[in-house]
Amino acid sequence: MSPKGVGHSKVEESAVQVAVRVRPLLPKEILHSHESCITSDPEERRVTLGNDRHFHCDFVFEDGSTQEEVYTNCVQPLIEAFFHGFNATVSAYGQTGSGKTYTIGEASISAFRDDEQGIIPRAVAEIFKLLDENDLIDFSVRVSYMEVYKEVFRDLLEVETASKDIHIREDERGNVVLCGVKECEVEGLDEVLSLLESGKTARHTGATQMNPHSSRSHTIFTVLMEQRRGGSRAANGSVQILSSKFHFVDLAGSERILKTGNTGERLKESIQINSGLLVLGNVIGALGDPKRKGTHIPYRDSKITRILKDSLGGNAKTLMIACISPSSSDFDESLNTLNYAKRARNIQNRATVNCRGEPDRIEGLELQIKALRRALENRQRSETRIIARSDPEKRLRPFEVDVRKLQAESAHYRTCTDSAYRLLTELQGEGTLNAGQILRVKEWLCGVEEERSGLTSASGLDSGIESSSTEDSTALKRRQAVLNNQDLVKEDWRGEREDYTSQLQAQIQQLEQENTDFLVALEDAMEQYKQQSDKLQEQQDLIAELHSLLAQPGGAGFLHLKQRPHTAPINSLLQTPDRLTPPCDSDVGRSLARQLDVGASVDSSSYSEQTQWDGTHGNTHCESSRKLNRDEDGHMQTTRDKRKSINVTWTKKDIAIPQGPFGGTRTALPQTLGLCHPLGMQFNRRTSNSSIGESSVWESVRGFGGEFCSDRGLLQAQQKIRELSITIRMKEELIKELVKTGKDAQAMNRQYSRKISELEAEAEQARVELTEAQKQLQELEVQGGRDAVDRSKAQECRRKIAAAQSKVQVLKQKQRDTAQLASLSAQSERRVQELERNVQNMKQQQDLLQRRLREESQQKRRLETEMQKGKHRVKELEIKNEQQQKILRIKTEEIAAFQRQRRSGSNGSVVSLEEQQKIEEQKRWLDEEMEKVLDQRRGLEDLEGELTKREEILAKKEALLWERSGLESKKLRSSQALSQDLLTLSSRIESLERELTERNGLLRSGSAQDSQQIRQEISNLRQEKELLLKQRVELDDKLRQGNLLSPEEERTLFQLDEAIEALDAAIEYKNEAITQRQRQLRASGSMLTQWEMNLMAKLTYLSASETRALLCKYFDKVVSLREEERRLQMALAELELRVEEQQNLVGWLEAALERQQLEADRRLTQQQKEHERNIQLLLQQCREQMDEGLAGRLRQYEGLIHNLSKELNFCKIANQELNIKLREMCGPVNLTGEQCKGLNCDSLLLAGAQSRVAEDVKPIIDAERVQKSREEMREPVNAPLPATWRRSSLPTEDQYTMEELRQRAACELPNNRIVQPGMNSTHWSGSTSLPVTRPRREPRRSSLNTAPLYSSSAIIDVRRNPV
C-alpha cells in the first residue's frame, strides 16, 4: 500500500467504530471454576451477554483471537487514513483486568513474542515500512507520551516536567493542541519502542485484588507526522504539507471498590478514575443520543475528554475497543462496557484532510490575480491617454508587418473555408450522409453564411467567400490602434511574465539545490542503512529461525515453570513417571509385609534417583550459567558496576521442579492410606490416576503464566540488543562531535599559542615598564619633590605603575583563560578514548548476547525434543488413566449399590447397636494397625536419611584424608629434600677441607711472593666452610625438630587431624544409630508378620454386612481426605499464582531499573553532545573574534605606520628648513675680530645647547612614542590624529631672530646644567627617559623660566604642541 496524492481538502463523515474483544478466563478464574457468560458471533458481529442481552458492533473478537487479527481488521485502515492526512484515534475501554493495556500494546515489549505484540508496535512498524517504500515523500515523525493521573497531566518522556507546564489549547481550525509536551523526533521503530518502554516504566501502576498490575492513570501515546509532497513542484512550485496525528489511548479501568478492595491512596485513585470515566460516559451519551442533539457537550469537565475532543465528534477517525471479561462474576461491569460501546456507535465524526500548503497557495494566487487585474486596468487607462497624445504614424510602423501577416493568414483560411464549403455542399447534394452527419453539415454551413453576412455588413463591401479585397483606410487605422493597444498590453504582460518566470527559475534552482542536498543526504542514509543491514543480517536470520521454531505446534505448552525473566528454559517433565504408578498389590498371605518393604524401598529409591537426576541436570544448568557469567565478567570487567543489572538479570538459578501439577505433596495422603489394605491400594491407584486425569485442567491453569517462559529469554535478549544498538549509535554520534570539537580546539590551540606568546611578550614589556617606573618614582622620592614639576612627575609615575600592574593582572588572566581553552583538545581526546572504550564494551556485550541467543535457541531445540518424548509418555499415561478410570467407575457403582441396599434394607437384616459398636472397635483397631505401618515406613525413611548422612560424612572424611595425605606427602618430600641438602653440604665441606689442607701445604713450601695470595684463598675457603657448617647445623635442627612445613600448613594439618577425629566420632555415632534402627525394624517386621496373620484371620471372620459397613466407613474417610486434599491443592495453586505474579513484578521492576539506568546514560550522552555543540559554537565565536581582533590590530598598525611615516617626512622637511635658516643666519658677514669672536662663541654656545637639548629630548621622545604606540595597540579601533595637528605646526610665522635664539640657548644652558644638592651629574639622562606628559607650549613669553624644554617640544613633537 502506498499513500496516494491528496488533492483538495475533503470532509468525510463517519461514525465511531466499535470493536468488542473478549479475553480468556484467567488462571484464578479457572481455578475457582468461574463460568463464561459471554456468547459471541463474529460473522453476525453480535455479542450476547447472558441469554437475552444482544449487542451489535462493528468488530467482534472471541477469546481465542490473536493480536494480528485485531490489528489487521481494525487498525490497519486507520493507518492508511493517517497517511492520507486524517487524524486517527484508537482507545481501549473496559473494566480493570480486561486486557486493555495488552491490546493497545503498552505492556512490556520484551515480555511478549512478535505475534503477541499489541497495536502500538505494529502500527509504528507499518508507518515506517510505508515511509521506507515512498522515498519521494519528505516526512518527519514525532511522538509524545503522557498520562492523566488524578486529573493532572504528566509527561512520561520528561518526568521532571511539572503539570502546570502542560496546557490544552485550540488552534484557528478548532483542533486540540497540547502545549508543553515533549515531542521526540524519531527515525525508526527501535527508537519508538525505546521511548515507549521508558514511558511505561514511569507510568503509575498498582496492585488491586482484581489485577496485580492495574493501570492507575489514563495514557495517551501520540504519533505526529508531517509529509511534504512535491508532486506539483514542476508546475507551479507548490508544496503540499500533510499533518496528521494518531492517538493511542489506554483508559484506566472502571473499578468497583468492593471488588478491588482499595483503601487509602488506591481509593483516591479509584475515585478520580471513576469520575473521569463518568464524564467520558456523559460526553458519549450526549453525542450518541439523537434526542440530545444541540445540547451542551461537557468536554471541559475532565482532562481526558478535552484531549479526546477531536476523537469524539470532531476531526478524526475513531476506533473504540471495548474489552470485556467473560467471567460471570464480572457480569455487571461487562454490561456497562457494552452499553458504552453501543452509545459510542451513534457518534458521527467529520474527518478532514489536514493540508496546509495548498489552501495557502490558492489564497495567495487569488490575491495575486486581483492585484494583476487592478494593475492591468490602470495600465490600460494610462496607455489610452499616452496613445491619444502620441504620434500615430510612429506607433503604426512596427505593426504593419504583423498586420500583413495576419491578412495573409486570413486569406489562406478563407480559401480553405471556400473549398470546404463547396465540398460539403456537393456531399449534401449526393445524399450519402446519414441524418446526424447531415445535421452537423447544415449547422456548419449556416454558421459560415452568418459569418459571411456579418463581414459583409461590417465592411460595407461585397465580400463573398472568395473575395479578398482590402479594408478602407479608416477601418484600418481603427484596427491598427486597437492592435497597438493590444500589443502594449502584451508587452506589459510579457515583462510581468518574464519577472514571474525569473522568480520561478530562481525557485526551480533553489529546489534543484535542495534536491541535490537531499540526494546527497539520501546517499549517505542509504550507505548507513546498508552498513546497518549488514551488521544486523545475522540477527535477522536468527530471529527468523526463532520465529519458525515458535510457529511449530506444541511449542512449550508443557513448560509449567515459575521462573524469572531472562532465565534459561528448563523442561518441567524431567521427572520420571514412576511416582504416578502404584505399587503392585497382592491379596494373600505373607507377601503383604514384603510388598510394604519393597514398595517403600522402591518408592524412596525412585525418589532419590529422581532427585539426583534433577540435581545433576540443574547443576549442568548452573555450570553453564556460571560459565556464561565468567565469560560475561571477562568481557564486561570495565563496566561491571555500570551494568550490574545485566549480570543479575542473566543469572540462571536452580528451579525446583515439582513432582506433579501442584508439587511433591500431591499424592502423599492417598499413598499413606493405600498401605493398610489392598482396597486402600486401589484407592491409591485411583487417586494417582485422577490426579493424572486432572493434569490437563491444572496445566491450563498454569499455562497462562508459564507457557512461553522459554521464549522470554530470547525476547528480552533481542530487546537488549536493540537497546544496545541505539546506545551505540548515540555514543558514536557523541564521538563524532568530540572529534569535531578536538579538531576545532587544535585549530584554536595554534591561534592561542601565538596569542599566548604575544601576551607573554606584552606582559614582559609591561613588567619592564613597571620596573622603570618604580625606579623613577624612587628617584623622585629621593629628590624630595621640591617643585611642582617633580610632584606631577611622581604622580604620573604612580598612575603608570598602577596601570602597568592592572595590565599585568589582566594579561595573566588572559593567559590563564587562553591556557584553559588550549586544554580543550586534550580533554576531548581523553573523552573520545573513554567513549571508544565504552562503545567497544557495548559491542562486546552485544556479541555476548548474540552468542547467548544462539545457545538458548539450541537449548530450546533440545528441550523441544524432550517435550516430544514427554508427550508420548503423557499419552501412555492417559491411556492407562482411562483404564483405571473404568475400574474406578465399576467400584464406585458397587459401593453405591451397597449403600442403596443398606438404606432400603434389602438384605433382610438391620445392623444392631452392638454390631455398630463392634464395627467401630474394628475400625479403631485397623487405624491403630495402620499407624503401626506408618511408623514402620517412617522408620525406614529415617534409616535412609541416616544412611545418606553417613555417606555425606564419609565423603567429607575422604576429602579431609585426601588433603591430609597431600600435606603429609609434602612433608615427606621436604624431609627428603633436606636429607639431600645435608648430604650435598657434607660433601662440599669435605672438599673444602681437602682444599684447605692443600693450600696449607703450598703455603709452607711456597715462595714469599705467592704466600700472600694463598693466605687470601685460605681465608676465603675458611669463611665458606664456616657458612656451610652453619647451614648444616640449621638443616640438622630443622630435620631433628620436624619443622618441614610452613606455620600455616602446620596449622592446617592440625585442624585436619581434629576434623578427621570428629568425623570418626560422628561416623561411629551414626553407625550405632543405624544399628539400633535396624534392630527396631527387624523387631517391627516380626510384629508386622504376626499382624498380617491376625489381620487376615479377623478379616476372614467378618461377615458380609460388617465388611460392607467397614468399607463404607473407610470410603467416607477417603472422600473427606480427598476434599481436604482438594482444598489444599487450590490453596497451593493460589499461592503459586501469587508467587508467579510476584516474580513477574520483580522482573518488571528489574527491567524498569535497567531502563532508568539506560535512560540516564542516554540523557547524559545527549547532554554531552549538546555540550560539545556549545563548545564548538564558542570556539567558532572565539575564532571569529580573534580574526576580527587581528584584522583590527592590523588596521591599527597600518594607521600608526602611516601616521609615523607622515611625521617622519614632516620632520625631514622641518629639519631642512631649519638648516637653511641656520645657514642664512650664520652666513658670511663683515665683522670685526671681536664680533667674529663673539659670534663664534655664540655659535658654539648655540650649537652646544642644541646638541645637549637634542640629547636630552631624544629619550623622552622615544619613550613617548613607545607609550603612544602601546596605547594605540590597546585601543580596539584606529584612533585618528588629533584635530589640532597641522603640517604648518613649525614656528614659521614666529621666526626667531639670532638674538632671541642666542638668549634662549644661554638661558637653557645653565638651567640644564644646574646640579642640585644630593643629585649626581646624570640626573637628566636618567630622568628624561621618563615618558611624562609635558604641558602644552604657550605662545612666546617674556620670562625665560616658564618653559625649560620649549625648543625641543616645539620642534620635534608637533602633535602634542601644535601652533
Swiss-Prot record:
Location of the protein in the cell: Cytoplasm, Cytoskeleton; Cell projection, Cilium
PROSITE patterns named in the record:
KINESIN_MOTOR_1, KINESIN_MOTOR_2
Listed under GO cellular component are:
cilium; cytoplasm; Hedgehog signaling complex; kinesin complex; microtubule
Q: Which residues bind ATP?
A: G94, Q95, T96, G97, S98, G99, K100, T101
Q: Where is the composition biased (Basic and acidic residues)?
A: 623-640
Biased composition range(s): Polar residues? 603-622, 1318-1331
Which GO molecular function annotations are given, in alphabetical order? Answer: ATP binding; ATP hydrolysis activity; microtubule binding; microtubule motor activity
What family does this belong to?
A: Belongs to the TRAFAC class myosin-kinesin ATPase superfamily. Kinesin family. KIF27 subfamily.
**What assembly does the database describe for this protein?**
Binds microtubules. Interacts with gli1 and sufu.
Role description? Acts downstream of smo as an intracellular repressor of hedgehog signaling pathway, mainly through the suppression of gli1 activity. This negative regulatory effect is enhanced in conjunction with the suppressor of fused (sufu) protein. Positively regulates gli2a activity by promoting its dissociation from sufu. Involved in the regulation of microtubular dynamics.
Under what name is this protein listed? Kinesin-like protein kif7
Q: Which organism is the protein's source?
A: Danio rerio (Zebrafish)
Q: Which gene encodes it?
A: kif7
